[in-house]
Swiss-Prot record:
A Pfam family the protein falls into: zf-C2H2
Zinc finger boundaries on the chain: C2H2-type: 41-66, 72-95
Function, as annotated: Transcription factor that participates in the transcriptional activation of glucose-repressed genes during exponential growth in non-fermentable carbon conditions. Also involved in salt-stress response.
Compositionally biased region (Basic and acidic residues): 353-369
Biological process (GO), any one: cellular response to salt stress
Protein localization: Nucleus
Family matches, as SMART domains: ZnF_C2H2 (SM00355)
Biased composition regions of type Low complexity, renumbered to the chain: 110-134, 332-344
Disordered: region residues: 1-37, 91-149, 326-374
The protein's name in its UniProt record: Nutrient and stress factor 1
Residues with Phosphoserine modification: S162, S163
Biased composition (Polar residues): 1-27
Span of the signal peptide: none
């Protein structure tokens, strides 16, 4: 024990032994301590400070105390420190302790008593809500005697006023999620695209009503209000032939304001040739006589107003059934006019004269005898009631 406590005395007591020299040397030359080390780094420049350090980083750390510099910052609380060890100690003592308590509180499971209290509270709240929604005019009353019996952490229940029926009905509807709204919008857009992309087939030719039903004419003396009629005959077929089927009658615009333009399907047809010859010889309606005798003989057809000669057979276009009534009723003055026209004409079956002088004389006589009830042909080309094209 004495050897360990006091080396000097131990060396003296053991001097009789042979090991005296070694013990005395060990006692005289002890190990070099930190304080006994050589301190080469001294603090200079600051009055009253005479400290010295063995390492340069220790001197720099000491100088920060004089300057007040704190380069080390805590990332959690943004607090600055002058030494790294102080920052490390701060984080371990302050922030690590807080994190440990927060994680332990999250991991702690609720006790059975808390679960029972929460279930009872939820059942009471559901019962109160059901009673409040069942009767719209009922209110829950709270007894003042039961107030002290409640726990301190529980809040006093509020008086629940019942809402009107229309509000309760809207509350019972489940909330609409954004996904359901998105799905409904997608369905609506898809339906709209299907409606827009529905195939629409255009007809190969425009739909036209070639047999437009005009109103039937009244028992008026004039016949100028009738629609114009275009007669079309087949290719290279005589209109007087009985073997061929009846020709088509196409009703054009009502009423014509000017000379109607005739369209021909084939240039070599009979009606096209007749029109070209009429245009070539400049035949006017004033130079053509109207045969009114055939109207009385054949009530279901008209005689053609334009005929190049008496030898050519007359064309008898077929009138549609809805127009037969209008053409079957002759005007009032047809008989007198026919008699006068037959007297002026000389012979009953003769319609035209071969010479221009006879045509002029006949026109002068017939212009006085024809009345308004006959089929009138306007010479000024403003209005033409019925147009017949003959070969």
């Amino acid at each position: 024990m004495e050897n360990t406590t006091n080396r000097n005395t131990a060396g003296v007591l053991t001097s009789s032994n042979g090991n005296f020299a070694t013990n005395s040397v060990a006692a005289s030359t002890p190990k070099r301590s930190k304080s006994a080390r050589r301190k080469t780094f001294k603090c200079t420049g600051y009055d009253g400070c005479t400290m010295s350090f063995t390492r340069a980083e220790h001197l720099a750390r000491h100088i920060r105390k004089h300057t007040g510099e704190k380069p080390f910052q805590c990332p959690a609380c943004l607090k600055f420190f002058s030494r790294v060890d102080n920052l490390k100690q701060h984080r371990e003592s302050v922030h690590a302790h807080k994190n440990h308590h927060s994680t332990s509180s999250h991991q702690r499971k609720p006790s059975s008593s808390s679960l029972s209290s929460s279930s009872s509270a939820s059942s009471s709240s559901s019962a109160s809500s059901s009673t409040s929604y069942s009767d719209p005019y009922r209110k829950t009353n709270i007894n003042s005697g039961n107030m002290p019996m409640m726990a301190e952490n529980e809040k006093a229940p509020q008086i629940i006023h019942s809402s009107p029926e229309f509000i309760t009905s809207t509350r019972s509807i489940p909330p609409i999620s954004p996904r359901s709204i998105y799905n409904t919008q997608r369905q609506q857009q898809h339906q709209q695209q299907q409606h827009q992309q529905a195939p629409y087939y255009f007809p190969s030719h425009p739909i036209t009503d070639s047999y437009y039903q005009y109103p039937l004419p009244s028992n008026n003396n004039t016949i100028n209000y009738l629609p114009s009629v275009d007669v079309q005959y087949p290719l290279n077929v005589s209109p007087s032939s009985t073997s061929h089927p009846a020709s088509e009658v196409i009703i054009s615009s009502f009423p014509p304001r000017s000379m109607p333009s005739t369209s021909f399907k084939y240039k070599d047809s009979a009606d096209f040739q007749a029109r070209t010859t009429m245009n070539k010889y400049n035949i006017r309606p004033s130079n053509i006589n109207v045969n009114t005798s055939n109207i009385n003989n054949h009530l279901d057809s008209f005689s053609p107003p334009f005929s190049p000669s008496t030898t050519v057979a007359e064309a008898k276009p077929i009138i549609l059934p809805q127009y037969q009534q209008a053409f079957s009723q002759p005007p009032n003055g047809n008989k007198n006019n026919n008699m006068s026209s037959s007297k002026n004409g000389g012979k009953g079956g003769e319609n035209f004269k071969n010479t221009d002088d006879r045509n002029d004389n006949n026109n002068k006589k017939r212009s006085e005898t024809l009345s308004e009830s006959d089929i009138s042909v306007n010479t000024n080309k403003k209005r033409l009631s019925v147009d017949y094209i003959l070969t």
